[in-house]
A protein has these predicted regions:
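Alpha/beta-hydrolase-fold enzymes
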Residues: 110-114, 124-261
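Short beta-strand/loop motif that positions the catalytic acidic residue
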Residues: 283, 289-291
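Catalytic active-site module of serine/aspartate enzymes centered on a nucleophile-bearing elbow/loop
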Residues: 312, 316-357
Length: 357
């Protein structure tokens, strides 16, 4: 695996906003060397593109720049840097797959021309990406890295129960749940709910416990020992509100063990497949599936995806890499991820670039 100990400076080159076809304002940031192959970084739900650009550690944009790649950091509508998790119209992951990711790719291609474009996606961002790809909305990508989950979501029984309770019992009463316990206050009508969600866990920080029991659906989102203390102290900045309106779609995907379309009766979403696995033959680029060996959020979803794709679609160039001792989010925000994780990504990009040359 590539040795990635150097720490070059990485100034922001460009930041701009764009509006999707359904009227949602999103942002893209470009960093890294000019005229280099481009890598679109797609974050998970309720975090933001900042998970890829942490100043306290050597992050993936540092590593990609040192390896000769240009990073494009997307904040899609599920970003905590944007207002849509707390206000604005409800959305599903169909909207991310149909609008956010394809239109971000189109904006990037306007600027890079015919240079190779890769995508590195995490968690829900990777689930939505799988819908976009199997809809044929992202032709000609040079390669894709999906971390944690891709086409075949799989969660624990306890997480399944939490998603059910969140969507059926709380969804009609609560619009969103804050990750930052300090925003709730002692006299809020939701204080007891937040106290219940954050009462368990080894960490004394209530926000950390909320992150695990909220976004993690009761599972650990990361291994504590892998986080820099400065990153842990900023969890309230890195995580935002949890919109409960997305839970029914997530539950439907988990029950199907596949990325599926939610809006099956709405013609506006007709371009998306009802079941992404049934259209996996539309994947036209190499795919690297990554997962931590201790991923409690999605268990062995990506190992399952590798096995299913290898059996059903042997023509797809897919490989699976498991990162020993890592959980879920620490594969990107862990203080040692530059040494333990990112080298696998760079090796994949380099190998694919060599084939294209």
């Amino acid at each position: 695996m590539t040795d990635l100990r150097a720490t070059p400076e990485l100034p922001a080159v460009e930041m701009f906003s764009f509006r999707t076809a359904d009227g949602v304002d999103l942002t893209l940031r470009r960093v890294g060397p000019a005229d280099a192959p481009a890598v679109l970084l797609v974050h998970g739900h309720g975090v933001s593109s900042e998970m890829f650009a942490l100043p306290e550690i050597r992050d993936i944009t540092d590593v990609l720049a040192d390896a000769g790649y240009q990073s494009w950091l997307l904040d899609w509508r599920g970003s905590c840097r944007l207002p849509y998790n707390e206000s604005g119209p409800a959305y599903t992951f169909d909207d991310v797959a149909l609008y956010d990711i394809p239109e971000a790719v189109a904006r990037i291609r306007e600027r890079i021309g015919d240079r190779p474009l890769y995508v590195v996606a995490h968690c829900i961002g990777a689930l939505a990406l799988s819908l976009s790809m199997t809809a044929g909305l992202l032709p000609g990508l040079a390669g894709v890295v999906a971390q944690g989950v891709f086409l075949t979501p799989k969660v624990s029984t306890s997480a399944r129960v939490r998603v059910l309770l969140g969507s059926e019992l709380l969804g009609s009463r609560v619009g969103h749940i804050e990750s930052d316990f300090r925003k709730v206050g002692l006299w809020s009508k939701r204080t007891l709910l937040y106290a219940a969600l954050s009462r368990k866990g080894d960490c004394p920080d209530p926000t950390c416990r909320m992150v695990h029991h909220g976004w993690g659906m009761g599972a650990k989102l990361f291994e504590h020992d892998h986080l820099d203390p400065r990153t842990h102290d900023r969890l309230a900045e890195l995580f935002g509100a949890i919109p409960l309106s997305v839970l029914p779609h997530l539950r439907q995907m988990e029950l199907a063990h596949a990325a599926v379309r939610w809006n099956v009766d709405d013609d506006r979403y007709g371009a998306l497949p009802e079941n992404a696995l049934d259209h996996a033959d539309r994947i036209d680029c190499p795919v690297l599936l990554l997962s931590g060996s201790r991923n409690e959020a999605w268990l062995d979803s990506n190992k399952l995806c590798y096995e299913v794709l290898s059996a059903r679609n042997p023509g797809i160039d897919v490989r699976y890499t498991e990162i020993p001792s890592y959980g879920h989010l620490d594969t990107f925000i862990g203080r040692g991820a530059a040494l333990d994780v990112f080298g696998h990504i760079v090796d994949f990009l380099d190998e694919t670039s060599a084939r294209l040359a």
